[in-house]
C-alpha cells in the first residue's frame, strides 16, 4: 500500500496542508517571513521599488520570482498563495521521483523510499520547511542531483537557477564536477546559465545592487541557533555579564553578543570555505582512486552541505532543509547504504522543530532544558558531518568492497 502513488500523493498533500496551517496560525508566526517580509517586498516591487534593483537585498534577485508568484491570490491571501507555489514546486519533485517506477523494479522501490523519507522529513522539520525561500532551491537542487550523471548539462543549468535564488546550491555544482566523468558539461552549463541570468539581472537596472546579497550576509554576526553560538548561549545562562542574546531588527534575527563573538564571527566564513574546499579535494582524490560517481556524489554532496551548516554563523532552522537534497539522492541510488545519514537527518529535523518554532521562546529565555535540546541538535549536525566525510573516505580506502551494497549501476541512475 505504501508504494501506491495515490497514498504518496495523499500524504504529500496532507503534510503540506498541516505545515501551512501551523505556519499561518501558530502564535510564534513560523511563516512570518512569508507574510511580514516577502509580501511587503513584493508589494513594493509592484509599486516600482524593487529589492535587489533599487537597493541591496539579502537574496539574489531571482528569489523575487517565486515571491511574486505567491501574489496570485492577492495580498490578503498571500500566505495561501505561497502555499500554492510551494505545493506546485514540490509536486514537480514528487512527480519526478515517481516517474518510470515500474512495479517490482529496484529503481522504483528506492525512489519511492526516497519520496517517503522526504515527505516525513518535511513533517519532522515543521512549518519552516515550507515557509522560507529555501524550499524552492532545495526542490531544484534535488532534481539537479538526480539527473546529474545522465544529464549533467541540465543539472548545471538547474543549479545556476537555484544559485540565483540563494547561493548555497553552488557547492553542489562543485561536487558534481568532482564526482562525475562528464564534468565539463555540468560546469559549462552552470557558468553559461549563471552568466545569462546575471546579464538579465543587470538588464533590469540592478547594477552593483545585484551582488548586494554577498555583503548583506557577510556582515552578520552569530545567530543564536548556529553551532558555534552554542558556547555563548551557555555563557549567557551562567554569566549574563559576559554574553547576552540581542535582537537585531534590521535583519529580524537574534544574535549572541559578548567577548570573543566578533572574532569567532570573522573566522566562520573562512572556515566554511576551507571546509568545502578540503572536501572537494578529498572528493577529487577519491574519484581519482577509482570510486564510481554513483557511489561518490551523494555522500560528497551531503558532507559539503552539512559542512555549510556546521561552520555557518547564521544557522537559521530552514538551513536544515538543505540536507534533503543529497539524502534523497543517496536513498534513491544506494538504498540501505544511506539508512544511517537518512535516520540522523530525520532526527535533526525533528529536534530543529522543537527549537523553532515550538521552543523558541524558551530558547530566548535561556531555559536550560532548551539549551540542552539546541546543544544536542548542533552536536548531531557535527556527527552527521563526520559520518558523511567517513563515507567519502571509505570509498577511497576500499571502493571495491562497497559494491557488495549493490547501489544502482550508473546506467540506471535517473
Spans of model-derived segments:
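Multi-pass membrane glycosyltransferase architecture that uses lipid-linked
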Residues: 1-213, 264-414
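Short hydrophobic/aromatic helix or loop-helix immediately within or flanking a transmembrane segment
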Residues: 40-43, 53-77, 222-259
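Transmembrane-lumen/periplasm boundary regions of multi-pass, lipid-linked membrane glycan transferases
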Residues: 194-221, 229-242
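Basic, Lys/Arg-rich DNA-contacting stretches centered on the C-terminal catalytic core
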Residues: 213-214, 256-262
Amino acid at each position: 500500500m505504501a508504494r501506491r502513488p495515490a497514498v504518496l500523493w495523499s500524504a504529500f498533500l496532507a503534510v503540506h496542508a498541516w505545515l501551512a496551517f501551523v505556519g499561518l496560525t501558530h502564535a510564534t508566526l513560523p511563516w512570518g517571513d512569508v507574510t511580514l517580509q516577502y509580501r511587503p517586498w513584493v508589494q513594493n516591487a509592484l509599486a516600482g521599488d524593487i529589492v535587489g534593483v533599487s537597493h541591496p537585498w539579502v537574496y539574489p534577485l531571482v528569489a523575487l520570482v517565486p515571491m511574486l508568484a505567491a501574489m496570485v491570490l492577492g495580498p490578503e491571501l498571500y500566505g495561501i498563495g505561497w502555499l500554492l507555489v510551494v505545493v506546485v514546486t514540490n509536486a514537480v519533485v514528487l512527480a519526478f521521483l515517481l516517474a518510470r517506477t515500474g512495479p517490482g523494479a529496484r529503481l522504483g522501490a528506492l525512489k519511492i523510499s526516497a519520496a517517503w523519507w522526504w515527505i516525513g522529513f518535511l513533517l519532522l522539520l515543521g512549518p519552516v520547511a515550507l515557509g522560507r525561500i529555501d524550499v524552492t532551491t532545495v526542490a531544484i537542487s534535488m532534481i539537479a542531483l538526480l539527473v546529474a550523471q545522465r544529464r549533467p548539462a541540465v543539472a548545471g543549468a538547474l543549479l545556476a537557477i537555484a544559485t540565483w535564488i540563494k547561493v548555497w546550491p553552488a557547492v553542489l555544482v562543485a561536487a558534481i564536477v568532482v564526482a562525475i566523468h562528464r564534468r565539463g558539461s555540468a560546469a559549462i552549463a552552470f557558468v553559461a546559465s549563471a552568466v545569462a541570468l546575471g546579464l538579465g539581472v543587470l538588464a533590469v537596472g540592478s547594477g552593483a545592487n545585484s551582488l548586494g546579497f554577498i555583503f548583506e550576509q557577510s556582515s552578520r554576526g552569530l545567530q543564536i541557533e548556529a553551532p558555534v553560538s552554542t558556547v555563548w548561549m551557555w555563557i549567557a545562562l551562567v554569566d549574563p555579564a559576559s554574553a547576552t542574546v540581542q535582537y537585531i531588527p534590521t535583519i529580524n534575527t537574534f544574535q549572541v553578543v559578548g567577548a570573543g563573538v566578533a572574532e569567532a564571527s570573522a573566522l566562520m566564513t573562512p572556515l566554511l570555505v576551507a571546509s568545502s574546499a578540503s572536501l572537494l579535494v578529498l572528493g577529487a582524490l577519491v574519484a581519482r582512486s577509482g570510486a564510481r560517481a554513483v557511489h561518490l556524489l551523494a555522500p560528497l554532496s551531503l558532507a559539503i552541505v552539512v559542512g555549510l551548516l556546521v561552520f555557518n554563523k547564521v544557522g537559521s532552522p530552514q538551513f536544515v532543509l538543505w540536507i534533503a537534497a543529497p539524502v534523497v539522492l543517496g536513498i534513491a541510488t544506494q538504498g540501505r547504504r544511506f539508512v544511517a545519514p537518512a535516520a540522523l537527518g530525520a532526527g535533526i529535523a525533528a529536534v530543529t522543530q522543537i527549537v523553532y518554532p515550538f521552543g523558541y521562546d524558551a530558547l530566548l529565555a535561556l531555559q536550560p532544558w532548551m539549551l540542552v535540546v539546541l546543544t544536542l541538535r548542533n552536536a548531531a549536525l557535527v556527527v552527521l558531518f563526520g559520518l558523511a566525510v567517513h563515507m567519502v573516505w571509505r570509498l577511497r580506502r576500499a571502493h571495491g568492497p562497497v559494491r557488495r551494497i549493490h547501489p544502482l549501476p550508473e546506467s540506471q541512475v535517473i
